[in-house]
């Protein structure tokens, strides 16, 4: 029970930090999504690296992390945040967050589909209500005029992708790589930073942050894109 209580508190702490992700993302301004993802994860990775070294934990532990854990962790971190910042920059923040934050409902749904698990009527009702609300929002606002490109459509698709990626990661992380230590998150963050910066160089126009945007990026890396992941993995 004590261990479960600590895990619950860690999860609540992570969710509290993630509540800062949107306002800090808005404060960072129109920084290209891949660049913003790369910079924030570089800060988060260096934070984890510093803590690991301060505790005397050898960096060689990262080399023993199985390939499937690397693929799952880096894929989820990279995909979720690139889509998150894309949604936040192309949609009103409230609309984006309403869809993105469907991930807890999807965790309930995906968990119930696993072997030895089952969905109760209350679970299905809650999931249906959440999805119906999101569908009403999308159908009401995301329908563009015929033949007219609509950045908002990209934003809604990005937000839906966020919800699917993070719920899938949360379920699979416990099922497939539960024995991987939390120190692996440091490697995931650093690898995500490198991958995101490479994607920025290849796919995005240059657009460096200015002024107070750097403070927002630092805060993102230390909190929602740093400490939050170590708490969630716990």
Residues covered by each model-derived region:
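Transmembrane alpha-helices of multi-pass small-molecule transport proteins
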Residues: 7, 30-79, 104-110, 164-169, ...
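Hydrophobic transmembrane alpha-helices of multi-pass small-molecule transport proteins
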Residues: 16, 48, 110, 119-142, ...
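Hydrophobic/aromatic residues within transmembrane alpha-helices
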Residues: 28, 36, 40, 87, ...
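Loop-to-transmembrane alpha-helix entry segments
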Residues: 40, 64, 68, 97-100, ...
């Amino acid at each position: 029970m004590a261990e479960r209580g600590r895990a619950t508190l860690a999860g609540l702490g992570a969710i509290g930090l993630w509540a800062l992700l949107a306002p800090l993302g808005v404060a960072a301004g129109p920084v290209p999504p891949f660049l913003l993802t790369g910079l924030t994860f570089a800060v988060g990775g260096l934070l984890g690296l510093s803590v690991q070294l301060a505790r005397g934990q050898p960096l060689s532990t990262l080399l023993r992390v199985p390939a499937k854990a690397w693929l799952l962790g880096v894929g989820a971190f990279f995909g979720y945040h690139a889509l998150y910042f894309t949604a936040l920059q192309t949609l009103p923040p409230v609309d984006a967050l309403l869809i993105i934050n469907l991930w807890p409902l999807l965790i309930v749904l995906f968990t119930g589909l696993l072997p030895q698990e089952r969905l109760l009527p209350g679970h299905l009702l809650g999931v249906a209500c959440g999805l119906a609300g999101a569908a009403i929002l999308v159908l009401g606002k995301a329908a563009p005029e015929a033949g007219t490109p609509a950045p908002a459509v990209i934003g809604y698709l990005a937000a839906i992708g966020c919800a699917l990626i993070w719920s899938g990661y949360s379920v699979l992380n416990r099922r497939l790589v539960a024995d991987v230590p939390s120190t692996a998150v440091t490697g995931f963050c650093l690898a995500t930073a490198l991958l995101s910066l490479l994607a920025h160089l290849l796919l995005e126009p240059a657009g460096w942050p200015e002024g107070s945007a750097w403070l927002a990026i630092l805060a993102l890396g230390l909190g929602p894109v740093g400490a939050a992941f170590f708490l969630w993995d716990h």
